[in-house]
Amino acid sequence: LHTAYRRQRQMCIRDSFDGFRTSHEIQKIEMLETEDLKPLVDQQALSDFRNRALTPERPVARGMAENPETFFAHRESCNPFYEAVPEVVEEYMNEITRITGRKYGLFNYYGDPEADRVIILMGSATEAAREAIDYLREEKGEKVGLVSVHLYRPFSVKHLLAAVPKTANRIAVLDRTKEPGANGEPLYLDVKEAYYGLENAPLIVGGRYGLGSNDTTPAQIMAVYENLQLPEPKNH
């Protein structure tokens, strides 16, 4: 993501993972070699970035004030740069896939290619979801799937729609946050907007999981799929 950041006019990109569930986990990992990743980094751009860093040795003032008559237009003028980010990130993800053999995408799909029920979420709970999907497919013969979100902002509607099987008629979007008073949590609202106005759009419901670092189990994920089978699935 940070190589994409330097490529895309120094736009800010933040890597995120879910709190204690990931940060305090003991796990065996396979590190990527620096020499393998080095060709992905524009060394001149990296040097330029470091030279622009704020330091007491070269004090500068930036963005101190902007008048109202220009601020609105200025904020809107950055839209094309944000709109280009998904394609740039996807390009670098494809390079990482080529180097490591690990499949990375803006949205990764796992499950039956003709799934009728799909869960959309991001973070460590995707591992529990994969276990639930394997069980339901192998033991129950159910057509279920999962879409894992890897690039949340900017949110690419095109890439999301490409990741979800066309056979999906019911979708559950799970957020690891609660926004009291809102009609739904952020990811749920993004997915609803993505399907707004489309012909034969699936039924979309929302839910929450893992608040306060509570573990999300495969059994809980299976309960979500069971809810999607109901004539009127519970929403939130």
Model-based region annotation:
Residues 1-13:
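Single conserved hydrophobic/aromatic residue that forms the stacking wall/gate
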Residues 15-108:
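Conformationally flexible catalytic loops at phosphate/diphosphate-handling active centers
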Residues 24-31, 131-132, 159, 182-186, ...:
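Short acidic, glycine/serine/threonine-rich loops at helix termini
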Residues 91, 99, 131-146, 196-197:
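Short helix-loop-beta junction
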Residues 113-142, 155-162:
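Redox- and metal-dependent alpha/beta enzyme cores, enriched for Fe-S-associated oxidoreductases
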Residues 141-170, 174:
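Core nucleotide-handling region used for phosphoryl-transfer chemistry
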Residues 170, 175-236:
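Peripheral docking tails and interdomain loops at the edges
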